[in-house]
UniProtKB/Swiss-Prot annotation:
Residues 1-21 form the signal peptide. Belongs to the UPF0319 family. The keyword Signal applies. This is UPF0319 protein VF_1616. Keywords: Signal.
């Protein structure tokens, strides 16, 4: 009976582990992972490793990142930063990593913004399908509120838009990186998105205070 109980317990444990299996995303040093599902993330890495890892639940996810290859020129390190890329993919029980072209000079690496020829691959080198877009911002790059920009992007019908949890993230969890002006921007943005009845209720609530 004890042996049967041990086997039964082992089977339940294995079943539980299998049920909770997830995606492991490996992120190289040259990738600046800004947001995952419109949230900031903390990557796990060892001291001597040139990569970091992130565990995700099975299903659909959105990653927001920059590609920053580094080139040695004499005593200097030249960093070529891409535009911000928004990408959405779906996977289950996969070990996923980034794959980028090999560039031998900063000048050639600048072509990445035009070509966007990168991949997500599993451990067997199979490509993971994804949708992508560049998050272009024409104003001052310093102090950008990326979470706000991505939340706004996610209201569009672009294939890379991420609808899961969008409203919760937009209203409650966007960090105020630009002071009170960010709250004002969001207020104007969602007011314009509202229907006429909602606008009237909102204006009435302000008038009554």
């Amino acid at each position: 009976m004890k042996i049967q109980s041990i086997f039964a317990a082992s089977f339940c444990l294995l079943s539980s582990i299998s049920a909770h299996a997830a995606i492991q995303l490996t992120v190289p040093d040259e990738v600046e992972l800004i947001l995952v599902d419109n949230q900031e993330v903390k990557l796990e890495s060892s001291f001597f490793s040139t990569t970091s890892t992130l565990d995700l639940e099975n299903g659909k996810h959105q990653i927001v990142f920059r590609y920053n290859p580094v080139f040695k020129q004499g005593k200097d390190n030249i960093i070529v930063s891409s535009d911000i890329i928004v990408s959405t993919f779906s996977a289950e029980d996969k070990e996923i990593s980034f794959k980028f072209p090999t560039y031998n000079s900063p000048e050639k690496a600048k072509a990445f913004n035009r070509d966007l020829n990168w991949e997500l691959i599993d451990k067997n080198n199979n490509s993971i399908p994804f949708a992508q877009s560049q998050l272009i911002y024409n104003g001052m790059q310093v102090g950008r509120n990326i979470q706000f920009e991505v939340a706004k992007f996610n209201t569009t019908e672009h294939p890379a838009a991420f609808k899961e949890g969008m409203v919760t993230v937009t209203h409650k969890e966007i960090k105020n990186e630009q002071g009170d002006n960010t709250a004002e921007q969001m207020l104007h943005y969602w007011y314009e998105k509202a229907d006429q009845a909602t606008k009237e209720r909102f204006l009435k609530s302000i008038t009554n205070k």
